[in-house]
């Protein structure tokens, strides 16, 4: 990867010898000159999800935990039949119509596995610049009380800093390419509880992040841009005078006259995709 965390040299950047953003050399020039070997200056780490999931099925105790979704699904369908299409309470994502519809139409099968991906940056030390970016896998097959616990979270990638990645897609490429292959071909699982082998397909059910993380993943302008949410609503922000920051305020500020931001007050009930 680039020493300034710009890109990972994978996919379309695989054959490059220098960063396309900052032009820093990819390989250690000293080693290359004296040993004729291509030694990367910096590396990042991708942990494939497939082997991690296979390991969870190799012990009867963890195998039992991985059966939560199937049990919950049966419970939800019993409630739907009893309550004329309604569930008793919406206490998990498996009560959602998005999930139920995919089960009904056969897209999601009993032996498949649903996952959530989440990406975020972390400052490792308080007194120095030391950003590190990671993405994790949350296994939705587990109970809600278990799936978010540290011991059940699976690492996906670790991107060393100190700077923020500029082409985050390049760092996600290897892990998601592996994930895509498992979606197409299936993942062979040994169920130690039932002592059987089966093929499971993976589903990326949710992709989550905080504000900066979502901005990095989506490549959009972010909440401080002029049109912070250009996909769902066209609400324009008001620029803070003398800065490049915009704020999505509904009421026009008093004594405010900034070019391009002089639109009238906006009724919150009028905000929609056709605004």
Give, region by region, the residue ranges found by the protein language model.
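Acidic, metal-ligating active-site segments
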Residues: 92-96, 102, 108-161
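Domain-level detector for long, ordered catalytic/regulatory cores in large eukaryotic signaling
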Residues: 15, 25-95, 99, 172, ...
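Short linker/helix segments within small regulatory modules
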Residues: 10-17
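Generic recognition of stable, solvent-exposed alpha-helical segments in well-folded globular domains
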Residues: 14, 48, 110, 114-117, ...
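Short, intrinsically disordered, charge-biased short linear motifs at domain edges
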Residues: 1-10, 212-220
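Short, cysteine/histidine-rich loop/knuckle motifs that typically chelate Zn2+
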Residues: 1-4, 21, 231
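Amphipathic alpha-helical interface elements that mediate macromolecular binding in regulatory proteins
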Residues: 17-20, 25, 51, 113, ...
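Conserved, non-catalytic sequence blocks in retroelement Pol enzymes and Pol-derived host proteins
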Residues: 8-10, 127-128, 160-168
């Amino acid at each position: 990867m680039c020493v300034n965390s710009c890109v990972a040299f994978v996919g379309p950047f695989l054959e490059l010898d220098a960063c396309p953003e900052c032009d820093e050399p990819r390989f250690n020039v000293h080693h290359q000159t004296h040993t004729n070997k291509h030694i990367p200056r910096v590396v990042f780490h991708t942990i494939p999800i497939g082997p991690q999931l296979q390991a969870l099925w190799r012990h009867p105790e963890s195998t039992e935990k991985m059966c939560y979704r199937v049990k919950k699904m049966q419970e939800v369908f019993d409630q739907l039949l009893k309550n004329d299409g309604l569930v008793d309470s919406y206490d998990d994502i498996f009560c959602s119509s998005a999930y139920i519809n995919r089960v009904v139409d056969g897209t999601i099968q009993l032996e498949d596995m649903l996952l959530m991906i989440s990406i975020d940056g972390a400052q490792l030390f308080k007194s120095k610049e030391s950003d590190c970016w990671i993405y994790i896998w949350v296994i939705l097959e587990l109970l809600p009380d278990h799936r978010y616990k540290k011991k059940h979270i699976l690492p996906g990638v670790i991107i060393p800093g100190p700077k923020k990645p500029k082409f985050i897609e390049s760092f996600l490429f290897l892990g998601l390419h592996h994930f895509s292959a498992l979606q197409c071909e299936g993942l062979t699982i040994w169920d130690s509880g039932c002592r059987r082998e089966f093929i499971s397909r993976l589903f990326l059910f949710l992709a989550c992040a905080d504000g900066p993380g979502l901005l990095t993943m989506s490549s959009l302008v972010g909440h401080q841009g002029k049109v912070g949410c250009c996909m769902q609503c066209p609400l324009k922000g008001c620029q803070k005078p003398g800065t490049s920051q915009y704020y999505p305020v509904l009421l026009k500020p008093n004594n405010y006259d900034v070019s391009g931001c002089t639109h009238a007050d906006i009724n919150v009930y009028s905000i929609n995709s056709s605004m």
